[in-house]
Amino acid sequence: MIYWIFLGLAIIAEIIGTLSMKYASVSGEMTGHIVMYFMITGSYVMLSLAVKKVALGVAYALWEGIGILIITIFSVMWFGETLSPLKIAGLVTLIGGILLVKSGTRKPKQPNCHRGNRPPSVQELKTQTTGHHKGVAVESGEHHAAA
């Protein structure tokens, strides 16, 4: 649950940072740039914490997609940017994509408790893909006969 909170904080920080960038470019104030630097940095830190348990593709899609949606809404309200029918169609498509990516995520049935949080070894990956256990798999190429 905490990792989803990290993702939410990453999204909020990205939105604030990006809107601050626009504010700084419109107003010329240095404060906007300072806020932008801190928020974008914080966003990446929070995102890196979130992807420890949230699938990277899902986390990135939500982080970027939700950010784009909210930034677009605030850009229209605060900065007078226009929202053409084509942009609206793009945003609707984006929402559909986010929903598909999120709904396509499922948890593994049984975690690999024997290896903890470390990534699988090369041998474990070979076993998973070939179904052979250590010492049983025959490497492709030459077969050696016993002399």
UniProtKB/Swiss-Prot annotation:
The keyword ATP-binding does not apply. The chain crosses the membrane at residues 1-21, 31-51, 54-74, 81-101. It comes from the Bacteria. GO terms for cellular component: plasma membrane. SUPFAM superfamilies: Multidrug resistance efflux transporter EmrE. Keywords: Cell inner membrane, Cell membrane, Membrane, Transmembrane, Transmembrane helix, Transport. Residues 105-147 are annotated as: Disordered. InterPro entries: Small_drug/metabolite_transptr, Small_multidrug_res, Spermidine_export_MdtJ. GO terms for molecular function: amino-acid betaine transmembrane transporter activity; antiporter activity; choline transmembrane transporter activity; spermidine transmembrane transporter activity. It is a multi-pass membrane protein. Forms a complex with MdtI. NCBIfam families: PRK10452.1 (NF007767). Belongs to the drug/metabolite transporter (DMT) superfamily. Small multidrug resistance (SMR) (TC 2.A.7.1) family. MdtJ subfamily. This is Spermidine export protein MdtJ. It comes from Yersinia pestis. The gene is mdtJ.
